[in-house]
Amino acid sequence: MLALGKLLELTLAGHEPSAKIQLTPDGTRLRWLDEGALEITPPAARDNGLDLLLSAGIHGNETAPIELLDRLLRGIARNELHPAARILFLFGNPEAMRRGERFVEQDINRLFNGRHEQSSGFEAIRACDLEHLAATFFGKDTGRTRLHYDLHTAIRGSKIEQFALYPWHEGRTHSRRELQRLRAAGIEAVLLQNKGSITFSSYTYGQLGAEAFTLELGKARAFGQNQLVNLDLLENALQALIEGREVIDDEPTLDGLQLFAVSREIIKHSDSFQLHLPADIENFTELEPGYLLAEDIADTRWVVEEQNARIIFPNPKVKNGLRAGILIVPDDGAGLA
């Protein structure tokens, strides 16, 4: 196997490879760009026009997606997978990965779309670097297809284990065909966002014109302890994408895929913020109308008003000014293109 196929080992060890470019027997080029960043270029005759960005490890303790990308990259380096797409593999937060922690100083996935310019420290610099790597990878060739999957696992359990967040940007419409692709990859639900965000996938969607998704793939566990996380469908789908073997129906069906829309975000304004939910509550737990969800300074209260409301990403420990939870409601998909 080519040494650059061991990107995860290099990243965890903090080593820079001596050889920055290597070729597989079938002519696929592997090029080391930066710590945790490797570009794959297929032979020109096999290039199908897809630019695929696969990122994981934005949170260093979310290991199942990291291990998935490691398996895919090793398959390419062993000449077992034969790419027809350009691919950028990114391990988002190498230092947090080495420590086995979600982040070192602050959450990188709250530092995109310019937010890193308002901050300092290791993660702010890394967020800027990731934006640059993504922008350079996608480049100025608008004739190619751009797709970004940012792979995560959650800090809590979920009633729907594998789900996606689809970013929003003014003037763009969510794609039914992309949702069909996710459904075939084992994704059970998609949250259709309705405002801009400061996450990595929101940056690539809004600023770089990619179809982009944050994929939540189960619960965060340590390296080597992901036997209960079944990513077989996603791994098969990514292999097909990489090799250009994907089959997409002419009339996309979303049968079995649950769609949700954001109703409200719960913003933590002060240290007095209280979230009235059990510490072990699962994502997608339903909340009844009238439920007092949270309280903050100046008599701020969040009371559930929506029918069939569910909560995702409840986290009272976020910094002041950040989102401490999202109330979502079912969506009929009428706005899809």
From Swiss-Prot:
Pathway assigned in UniProt: Amino-acid degradation; L-arginine degradation via AST pathway; L-glutamate and succinate from L-arginine: step 5/5
A family per Pfam: AstE_AspA_hybrid
Gene Ontology BP, a term: arginine catabolic process to glutamate
EC number of the protein: 3.5.1.96
Coiled coil (UniProt feature): none
Residues where Zn(2+) binds: H59, E62, H152
Active-site residues annotated for this sequence: E216
Catalytically driven reaction(s): N-succinyl-L-glutamate + H2O = L-glutamate + succinate
Cofactor dependency: Zn(2+)
Record's cofactor remark: Binds 1 zinc ion per subunit.
GO molecular function: hydrolase activity, acting on ester bonds; succinylglutamate desuccinylase activity; zinc ion binding
Alphabetical list of Gene3D superfamilies matching this protein: Zn peptidases
SUPFAM superfamilies: Zn-dependent exopeptidases (SSF53187)
Keywords: Arginine metabolism, Hydrolase, Metal-binding, Zinc
Similarity remark: Belongs to the AspA/AstE family. Succinylglutamate desuccinylase subfamily.
Function as written in the Swiss-Prot or TrEMBL entry: Transforms N(2)-succinylglutamate into succinate and glutamate.
Protein name per its UniProtKB record: Succinylglutamate desuccinylase
Species: Ectopseudomonas mendocina (strain ymp) (Pseudomonas mendocina)
